[in-house]
Design a protein with these regions (language model features):
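Acyl-donor-binding surface of acyltransferase catalytic domains
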Residues: 26-101, 235-240
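Short amphipathic alpha-helix that is part of the acyltransferase structural core
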Residues: 19-26, 87-127
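A conserved beta-turn-beta hairpin within the catalytic core of GNAT-like acetyltransferases
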Residues: 8-25, 68-71, 147, 167-176, ...
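A short, internal acetyl-CoA/4′-phosphopantetheine-binding micro-motif in the GNAT/acyltransferase core
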Residues: 19-30, 50, 178-186, 213-214
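Conserved active-site alpha-helix within GNAT-family acetyltransferase domains
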Residues: 52-67, 187, 191, 203, ...
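A conserved beta-strand-loop-helix scaffold within acyl/acetyltransferase catalytic domains
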Residues: 117-135, 139-155, 159-173, 178-180
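Conserved GNAT acetyl-CoA-binding A-motif
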Residues: 40-51, 201-213
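Conserved acetyl-CoA-binding loop-helix of GNAT-fold acetyltransferases
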Residues: 29-38, 177-182, 186-203, 222-226
């Protein structure tokens, strides 16, 4: 079973991880049948497909791709009343926009919280996932990737959690990272972060907020469902690495 796609070299990821990385582009108009010899030029080749695309999944499996992780993308409508999020924040807590001085503590938290992701062994080295997300949250605070980072804090100023947000268009925003600080679990901080993101969207006249998470992250799946978000799509991430036996 053949697979048609373009092989797009991922320069930034190649440099960051020190691994020659490519990603298959199935939407390319000039897509050609992929040969195993072409894939051998890269340490890692990534593919993201719709979870319902069984034919393409079978074709990728024959090329030596392995399932890495499933992904669920949610969409939350902003214009409707939302009692769950409207009552999420307490008067003893506040929401601030993260500033550069807070980057070190946020990097440390992100490196710890996001240690398990699709950037995992055996394709990536231990610590690579944490390094990636630490840089992500730094860029979110600086506004060079996501556009802002909101912090839920105690009245004392201690950070309880963070959520980064990106403008997609006039009507739509997307959550990049959402995490509770280590040691602050079990206090409903995830709900408070979703409340902060929801308020931010209302303030910026957004009509929809998108957020994706791993299928294995049951806590996040439950949080987004309780927040009123609906499943918009599901997908699989697959990798082919030079370590794989084909």
């Amino acid at each position: 079973m053949s697979v048609r796609a373009n092989i797009d070299h991922q320069q930034w990821e190649s440099d960051f991880f020190g691994l020659s990385t490519a990603k298959l582009d199935f939407a390319a108009q000039q897509a050609e049948i992929i040969l195993e010899s072409q894939l051998d030029d890269y340490a890692i080749v990534q593919a993201k497909i719709s979870a319902g695309d069984i034919e393409r999944l079978d074709g990728l499996s024959q090329l030596g791709f392995s399932l890495v992780e499933g992904e669920v993308d949610f969409a939350l409508t902003i214009g409707t009343e939302n009692a769950y999020l409207n009552s999420g924040l307490l008067v003893t807590e506040r929401v601030d926009i993260a500033v550069a001085d807070e980057i070190p503590v946020l990097r440390q938290a992100a490196e710890q919280v996001f240690s398990q992701s699709r950037f995992r062994a055996p394709w990536y080295c231990d610590g690579d996932s944490g390094r990636f997300y630490a840089l992500w949250i730094e860029k979110a605070v600086l506004g060079t990737f996501d556009h802002t980072c909101l912090l839920v804090k105690e009245a004392s100023g201690a950070i309880l959690g963070f959520v980064s947000l990106r403008h997609l268009d006039d009507d739509t925003a997307r959550i990049g990272l959402l995490a509770v600080m280590p040691g602050a679990n079990g206090r409903g901080i995830g709900r408070k972060l979703m409340s902060a993101a929801w308020v931010w969207c209302k303030q910026h006249q957004k009509r929809q907020l998108n957020v994706a998470t791993q299928i294995s992250n049951v806590a996040a799946l439950n949080l987004y469902s309780r927040s009123g978000a609906a499943v918009a799509s599901t997908a699989y991430w697959l990798y082919r690495g030079q370590h794989d036996s084909i």
